[in-house]
From Swiss-Prot:
A GO biological-process term: barbed-end actin filament capping
Name listed for the protein in its UniProt record: F-actin-capping protein subunit alpha-1
Modified residues (N6-acetyllysine): 19, 97
Coiled coil feature spans: none
PROSITE patterns: F_ACTIN_CAPPING_A_1, F_ACTIN_CAPPING_A_2
Oligomer and partners: Component of the F-actin capping complex, composed of a heterodimer of an alpha and a beta subunit. Subunit of dynactin, a multiprotein complex part of a tripartite complex with dynein and a adapter, such as BICDL1, BICD2 or HOOK3. The dynactin complex is built around ACTR1A/ACTB filament and consists of an actin-related filament composed of a shoulder domain, a pointed end and a barbed end. Its length is defined by its flexible shoulder domain. The soulder is composed of 2 DCTN1 subunits, 4 DCTN2 and 2 DCTN3.
Main location: cytoplasm
Length: 286
């Protein structure tokens, strides 16, 4: 280990550690962080050098956070990043400090949001909240309104997760949707991501994403929001159905082709009988 430490610079160690952290499966950040911490054996170097990786992970994963005094959780995303570890909660019109390691919010302050797009953002937010409530048992969403390159833009982010460490699996759904307010029609651009990790007696990960494009009729705020949500619903239903069908096909064909159902002898092994033989033999020898 000493030779390894001598050969690898602190900069390279931090780069490797950051790589592990940013690729941590959903719901397993703490486990990966603790393992990396043991390997690096230098807390100051890890906290200072890999702090950017903590932030990247939380923004990429759309980590939801509860702010004390406010009912709804908000997502940590690049679209709400105000710098200096402060993030925007457009629904509650506040900014807050976020600890990327502890995943805790603090110091909420009033913040100007929407950039003159208040009615557009609120219409889309209201419609999206209703959709998420209907389709996700543990879902959260945040809607931003921004002017990007002179274009008035609505950005909608959705996150839903199920963490079941006692059953050896964790999973997260993320989707991001954008459109510019350019009557009479606008292009909707979306990306959908699924990441699931199953690790009982093995290590299997599903990492999937799909890019979506569609056209949207831009009229008044309420009607446009309704059409926007309809596009989201159709695309996400189609994606989920395709994933389910693909895995059923793999289960019926691909996975079965990977191994024999019976060994070469064409006889199933009775493991319980073998175990009883072994125990009996050991008792005789005793």
């Amino acid at each position: 280990m000493a030779d390894f430490d001598d050969r690898v610079s602190d900069e390279e160690k931090v780069r490797i550690a950051a790589k592990f952290i940013t690729h941590a499966p959903p719901g397993e950040f703490n486990e990966v962080f603790n393992d990396v911490r043991l390997l690096l054996n230098n807390d100051n170097l890890l906290r200072e050098g890999a702090a950017h990786a903590f932030a990247l992970y939380n923004m990429d994963q759309f980590t939801p956070v509860k702010i004390e005094g406010y009912e709804d959780q908000v997502l940590i995303t690049e679209h709400g990043d105000l710098g200096n570890s402060r993030f925007l909660d457009p629904r509650n019109k506040i900014s807050f400090k976020f600890d990327h390691l502890r995943k805790e919010a603090s110091d909420p302050q009033p913040e100007e949001v929407d950039g003159g797009l208040k009615s557009w953002r609120e219409s889309c937010d209201s419609a999206l909240r209703a959709y998420v409530k209907d389709h996700y048992s543990n879902g959260f969403c945040t809607v931003y309104a921004k002017t990007i390159d002179g274009q008035q833009t609505i950005i909608a982010c959705i996150e839903s997760h199920q963490f079941q460490p006692k059953n050896f699996w964790n999973g997260r759904w993320r989707s991001e949707w954008k459109f510019t307010i350019t009557p009479p029609t606008a292009q909707v651009v979306g990306v959908l991501k699924i990441q699931v990790h199953y690790y009982e007696d093995g290590n299997v990960q599903l990492v999937s994403h799909k890019d979506v494009q569609d056209s949207l009729t831009v009229s008044n705020e309420a009607q446009t929001a309704k059409e926007f949500i309809k596009i989201i619903e159709n695309a996400e239903n189609e994606y989920q159905t395709a994933i389910s069908e693909n895995y059923q096909t793999m289960s019926d064909t691909t996975f079965k082709a990977l191994r024999r159902q019976l060994p070469v002898t064409r006889t199933k092994i009775d493991w319980n009988k073998i175990l009883s033989y072994k125990i009996g033999k050991e008792m005789q020898n005793a």
